[in-house]
UniProtKB/Swiss-Prot annotation:
Keyword annotations: Electron transport, Heme, Iron, Membrane, Metal-binding, Mitochondrion, Mitochondrion inner membrane, Respiratory chain, Transmembrane, Transmembrane helix, Transport, Ubiquinone
Cofactor, how bound (note): Binds 2 heme b groups non-covalently.
Self-association state and partner proteins as the record states: The cytochrome bc1 complex contains 11 subunits: 3 respiratory subunits (MT-CYB, CYC1 and UQCRFS1), 2 core proteins (UQCRC1 and UQCRC2) and 6 low-molecular weight proteins (UQCRH/QCR6, UQCRB/QCR7, UQCRQ/QCR8, UQCR10/QCR9, UQCR11/QCR10 and a cleavage product of UQCRFS1). This cytochrome bc1 complex then forms a dimer.
Ligand binding (heme b b566): H97, H196
GO molecular function terms listed in the Swiss-Prot or TrEMBL record: metal ion binding; ubiquinol-cytochrome-c reductase activity
Name the UniProt record assigns to this protein: Cytochrome b
Domain of life per record: Eukaryota
Annotated transmembrane regions: 33-53, 77-98, 113-133, 178-198, 226-246, 288-308, 320-340, 347-367
Any further remark recorded for this protein: Heme 1 (or BL or b562) is low-potential and absorbs at about 562 nm, and heme 2 (or BH or b566) is high-potential and absorbs at about 566 nm.
Localization of this protein: Mitochondrion inner membrane
Signal peptide boundaries: none
Membrane-topology descriptor: Multi-pass membrane protein
Length: 381
């Protein structure tokens, strides 16, 4: 009798995706982040569901409902901080996952890559709306500042902002709809993840060399299930260390003050994982220009397949582009630091230089270095 996992209509889908899936034999730990992102999404949906049972999306009670969760609900503090810090872990894994894709040329799987970009945008939208829900000072002012950016759109901007707000300012209508969207989006993300995997399994995984690995495939289980399990344990260790010892390390103290429309905090800034994009936004003096640069800072990922000039897929054997890649990584850290600093000298000029180099490295220097490397190898025509 044939094994049920190979014949049952539902189980065989899981079998082809996680058990008998042919995987390259040489994929490194950089390939662990896909499964870790799946784990993060599950943690966020489960903790979020339990938080939603006790949360009220009303401006008068939102802040106190979060306080109630932390003080009165059994292990409410644990659920709340797992959810808040789980978002940080989610973005750490996301950035490393995207960085891996850039380094090893995984963006040549166009469908998988484009769904990934949509997933990144959806996750950023979800995280932004989630940050508004506790209705602290930074929640309120963050929502006001970021939604206000849409007013830079010519002609329809102001109308659009008021439509999103549900009034003439961020108020009860805004909070209620943000809660509704924050609840539904993770399930949309989960559906997109399935599509992401569907497209990936059409082509099979990439590997560090960037070469075709059809001649040397191994089954996903037990080799990569056990490898993923190590990553899972490390992620949980890191997350729980953060939650139990440093729960407020990545948060903003201003968010422990209830939202007050009459009192603006001295430095309005988003969560740490948006700071690089926030720095790019602030580095351009023009409002519309800043918004376009902000969107382009993420959307530039969609142009990577067209900017690939090298005859090699991966950066594994491309030392010049490797140097540029790590310069880009360092540049992103500088942008993250600048995004959290006040708008004054010398931070303004550092942010502007870092923004210019961010786009220059991706759009100009990396494509040129790809051509140079091909010439050095006498591969070019």
């Amino acid at each position: 009798m044939t094994n049920i996992r190979k014949t049952h209509p539902l189980i065989k889908i899981i079998n082809h995706s996680f058990i008998d899936l042919p995987a390259p034999s040489n994929i490194s730990s950089w390939w662990n982040f896909g499964s870790l992102l799946g784990l993060c999404l599950m943690i966020q949906i489960i903790t979020g569901l339990f938080l939603a049972m006790h949360y009220t999306s009303d401006t008068t009670t939102a802040f106190s409902s979060v306080t109630h969760i932390c003080r009165d609900v059994n292990y409410g503090w644990l659920i709340r901080y797992m959810h808040a810090n789980g978002a940080s872990m989610f973005f750490i894994c996301l950035f490393l996952h995207v960085g891996r894709g850039m380094y090893y040329g995984s963006y040549t799987f166009m469908e998988t890559w484009n769904i990934g970009i949509i997933l990144l945008f959806a996750t950023m939208a979800t995280a932004f709306m989630g940050y508004v829900l506790p209705w602290g000072q930074m929640s309120f002012w963050g929502a006001t500042v970021i939604t206000n950016l849409l007013s830079a759109i010519p002609y329809i901007g102001t109308t659009l902002v008021e439509w999103i707000w549900g009034g003439f300012s961020v108020d009860k209508a805004t909070l209620t709809r943000f809660f509704a969207f924050h609840f539904i989006l993770p399930f949309i993300i989960a559906a997109l993840v399935i599509v992401h995997l569907l497209f990936l399994h059409e082509t099979g995984s990439n590997n560090p060399t960037g070469l075709n690995s059809d001649a040397d495939k191994i089954p996903f289980h037990p080799y990569y299930t056990i490898k993923d399990l190590l990553g899972v344990l490390m992620l949980i260790l890191f997350l729980m260390t953060l939650v139990l010892f440093f729960p407020d390390l990545l948060g903003d103290p201003d968010n422990y003050t209830p939202a007050n429309p009459l009192n603006t905090p001295p430095h309005i800034k988003p969560e740490w994982y948006f700071l690089f994009a926030y720095a790019i936004l602030r580095s351009i003096p023009n409002k519309l220009g800043g918004v376009l640069a902000l969107i382009l800072s993420i959307l530039i990922l969609a142009f990577l397949p067209f900017l690939h000039t090298s005859k090699q897929r991966s950066l594994m054997f491309r030392p010049i582009t490797q140097v540029l890649y790590w310069m880009l990584a360092a540049n992103l850290l500088i942008l993250t630091w600048i995004g959290g600093q006040p708008v004054e000298h010398p931070f303004i000029i550092i942010g502007q230089l870092a923004s210019i180099s961010y786009f220059s490295i991706i759009l100009i220097l990396m494509p040129i270095s790809g051509i140079i490397e091909d010439k050095l190898l006498k591969w070019s025509l």
